[in-house]
Structures are given as C-alpha cells and as structure tokens.
Design a protein with these regions (language model features):
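Short hydrophobic beta-strand element within catalytic cores of glycosyltransferases
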Residues: 184-189, 193-196, 206
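A short helix/loop element that forms part of the nucleotide-sugar donor recognition site in Leloir-type
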Residues: 66-82
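Conserved donor-binding/catalytic core segment of Leloir-type glycosyltransferases
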Residues: 83-99, 105-109, 121
Length: 271
C-alpha cells in the first residue's frame, strides 16, 4: 500500500528518470491512499488512470477544534491582545515563501487606511519569519507575528478570527505546491471561513464559495484584497460559510469518519 500527500509524488512525477521508478511503484501497489484529489491526480499522471486510488483527507479533532461561544471569543481575543471589535484575520502555518504570508501582509497594509479596525495575526515559525517581520515594519502593516502557537492555544486562535487565511502559491514551475493544508480543515472545524490560494490541494480543503474562497492568483495583492474585503463586509455570508465549514469538518474531516473509510479500504485490500 502507498500513501500520498503531495510533494513525494509531484516532484518525482515531473522528472523523467524518477517518474519511471514512481510509475512502477504505483502500478505495483495493492492500493493507494491519497490525501486529496490533487495527489490522486498527480499519481494518475505518473502511473495511469487505472490505479486503485482512494481519497482520504487529513483528519481533524472536531471536539478540540470547535466554534467558540460569544464569551469565549471575547476572552480569546483578549488573550491574544485583540480588541473585541477588530476585523481579525488569522493565519497559521510553517513560515516558508510558498505559504504566501508576504501577500497577506501587503494586503493588510493596503486595506488598513479604509479599514482601521483590521488586524492580522500570524502564528508559526520558520525560515521566512525574519523577512516577513521586516516587510511588516517597512509597510507599517497591522500585522503581528505570534511565533509558535501551542497546541492548547491553537483552537482559540482560530476560533476568535473572522477569517482564516493562507495564500499558498505554486513555485518552481509547479514542483512546489500545497499538498492539502490541514490549517484549512482546522479553521473549518472551528466554524471560521477560510481564504486559500489556488495551489495543489488547497481547493480540496476549501470549497470555493461554500466554506471560503480560493483566490485564483494568490500573488495578486488587489485580487486578494478584494476577496478579503468582500468577506469582511458580508457578515451574513461569513455566517453561512461558518455553518458549512463546521458541517463539512464533522462529515468529512472528523477522525471517526476517516477511520471508517480507512477500515473499509484495509478490509478490501486484506482479502
């Protein structure tokens, strides 16, 4: 059995010699479990359309990642130093260039004059942290870097946001893409609409127009700014996306649901 997430099939699948090896491995697999339609598509590109593939997305603990009550939301905002009436965007990830936080910072700076209550919190660490902080300082953007967020804090950080955003983008001619984006399903489980960049499996994680928005060109500051402003301006749309996000998390990403799916696959393979 082979399990695929993203880069381990995308990169060798695009290089002639390694593609031959990958194709042989995939064709000889008793079954293939893919984390989304993106790695499944990449596998078919390398090994053919007849591969035995089942898509089982990454899971989320829907009891731990849950919507906050109004009081919990206020308390959580105060924990992170955010005012009750702020328009809060939260981004959580390993900080590397393809995650697109530089674009989010530029968007926050561009919108700040017309939206003085806008606040962006970025949680996570990584090699891009220093560059991002310099960009924040240069632009005077209403963005605060939180550094590493503990597992205990994470659900509250998502839950107190109006929108969660990670503008993931493809790099190196498509060799570097987003495999899935577990941060999107965590935010969804908290009932928070998500904004994703169109890259790899992000469109599997975020249903465009239903649980959030997928930006076609995540490096286009104007396009992203329009998307952000649209969601922040429309509280009713956000409430619809909140409900849809939570329902999808319970029905699609919950560990109990995924365990049953995996058990069915293993039962078939074991016969």
């Amino acid at each position: 059995m082979v399990v695929l997430h993203g880069a381990e099939v995308t990169v060798p699948g695009r290089l002639p010699l390694s593609r031959l090896v990958l194709s042989r491995v995939l064709k000889n697999a008793s079954h293939i479990i893919a984390a989304g339609e993106y790695p499944a598509s990449e596998a078919r590109h390398a090994g053919g359309n007849s591969l035995p593939i089942t898509v089982i997305p990454p899971g989320v603990d829907t009891q731990r990642f849950r919507p906050l009550s109004s009081d919990e939301r206020i308390t959580s905002r105060r924990e992170f130093g955010v005012s009750d009436d702020a328009e809060l965007i939260v981004g959580v990830s390993r900080l590397v260039p393809r995650k697109g936080f530089d674009t989010l910072i530029e968007v926050a700076a561009a919108l700040h004059a017309s939206r003085p209550r806008l606040q962006v919190l970025i949680g996570g660490g990584g090699r891009d942290a220093v560059r991002l902080q310099k960009l924040i300082d240069k632009l005077g953007a209403p963005v605060r870097m939180l550094g590493r967020v503990t597992d205990e804090q994470l659900p509250r950080l998502y839950g107190c946001a109006d929108v969660s955003a990670m503008l993931c983008r493809s790099r190196w001619g498509g060799l570097e893409q987003e495999g899935f984006g577990i941060v999107f399903s965590e935010a969804a489980s908290c009932g928070v609409p998500q904004i994703a960049g169109k890259s790899g499996g992000a469109a599997d994680a975020v249903l465009d127009g239903l649980t959030g928005k997928v930006v076609q060109n995540p490096s286009d500051v104007a396009q992203v700014a329009n998307t952000v402003a649209h969601l922040l301006d429309d509280a009713f749309l956000r409430s619809l996306m909140s409900v849809a996000s939570r329902e999808r998390a319970l029905n699609t990403f919950d560990y109990n649901v995924l365990t049953k799916s995996l058990a069915q696959v293993l039962t078939v393979v074991a016969r």
